[in-house]
Amino acid sequence: MTVLHSVDFFPSGKAPVAIEPRLPQAAFPEHHHDFHEIVIVEHGTGIHVFNGQPYTISGGTVCFVRDHDRHLYEHTDNLCLTNVLWRSPDAFQFLAGLDQLLPQEQDGYYPSHWRVNQSVLQQVRQLVGLMERAGDGMDAPAVANREILFMQLLVLLRRSSLMEGATNNDAKLNQLMAWLEDHFAEEVCWEAVAEQFSLSLRTLHRQLKQHTGLTPQRYLNRLRLIKARHLLRHSDHSVTEIAYRCGFGDSNHFSTLFRREFNWSPRDIRQGRDAIIQ
């Protein structure tokens, strides 16, 4: 597995934060690093496999990667990221208690992926721009200024994430997409889902297409197929059982959609034939 080292990314041996844009981010094999990372998805779509679990990411996704996490990107489509790298909580001179602003693992579950709306994403861009222009002076005021900007970024993300709730259409769509991550295997009536999240059906279709480039049903199918591929690789369930577990009522239809999405059949994935090009 590829290991990325801080010496290759941080401007100096003492700098606690670095900005690393990926415009665009191509598919990238599984790796981990000796620093922490906040991944901000500007736009585009892709699959982020995080500690073996697949997530569909799009503009507004924010992922918190710790120094022991492993992850990779695949099936990227114009995926543009801004990575805010930071060494460790004890690398800062003026900041303490950062863990209170970061997602925390509880009972083995780590809420690594948050979502923010487009208005907040614009504020994030402005803060990142200030961080990039802050210079690399090591006198106390310069260091404090850079650390303050990093703290402002964490506060903005924390306040604006799904954890804090919101009422505008962007936030409602973010909540809907998070709901689909947990309920993808259920029969989905888009009219009922739109009503559940206080969106008109037309707004749901338009905004989901703007965020992901996919219609609602196409997005749901991709989500189901990604989850199915994970089960094919990491479980002993039959192809038919996996199809049903992931919301497909017909295993033949599932196999057709699967091959169309990944250019491999479910059986190919089960037998590891795709591993050669991973």
From Swiss-Prot:
Q: CDD domains annotated for this entry?
A: cupin_RhaR_RhaS-like_N (cd06977)
Q: Which UniProt keywords apply?
A: Activator, Cytoplasm, DNA-binding, Repeat, Rhamnose metabolism, Transcription, Transcription regulation
Q: Which residues bind DNA?
A: 191-212, 239-262
Family annotation (InterPro entries): AraC-bd (IPR003313), AraC_XylS_family_regulators (IPR050204), Homeodomain-like_sf (IPR009057), HTH-like (IPR037923), HTH_AraC (IPR018060), HTH_AraC-typ_CS (IPR018062), RhaR_RhaS-like_N (IPR047220), RmlC-like_jellyroll (IPR014710)
Single Gene Ontology MF annotation: DNA-binding transcription factor activity
- Provide a GO CC annotation, any one: cytoplasm
Note the SUPFAM superfamilies from the entry.
Homeodomain-like, Regulatory protein AraC
Q: Name one GO biological process term.
A: rhamnose metabolic process
S-adenosyl-L-methionine as UniProt keyword:
no
The protein's location, in the record's own words, is: Cytoplasm
Boundaries of each HTH araC/xylS-type domain copy?
Answer: 174-272
PROSITE patterns in the cross-refs: HTH_ARAC_FAMILY_1, HTH_ARAC_FAMILY_2
* Complexes and interactors: Binds DNA as a dimer.
Describe the task this protein carries out.
Activates expression of the rhaBAD and rhaT operons.
The protein's name in its UniProt record: HTH-type transcriptional activator RhaS
Which organism encodes this protein? Salmonella typhimurium (strain LT2 / SGSC1412 / ATCC 700720)
